[in-house]
Amino acid sequence: MIKPLIEFCVGNLASGSQAALEKLEKDPNLDVMEYGCLGYCGICFEGPFALVNGEVVQGATVEELVNNVYEYLDENPMF
């Protein structure tokens, strides 16, 4: 079974999204990856974000980012 892919930029992890990565890694239904740079420097500077199946998902806080990731997945099922 293909799992949704959640990608984080290491620069954004240092800016606060590390806690979101740790929460999402606990979900066995997700593939969570960390990369050196995802090429979204402007968005990265603004606040917590992740790529969810290649689409940018943001949140004002870590909690909001996690909620927005799950909301995006609910609204955009893979199959």
From Swiss-Prot:
Entry-linked Pfam families: DUF1450
Segments traversing the membrane: none
Coiled coil start-end: none
Family from the record: Belongs to the UPF0349 family.
NCBIfam families xrefs: PRK13669.1
Protein name as catalogued: UPF0349 protein BC_4937
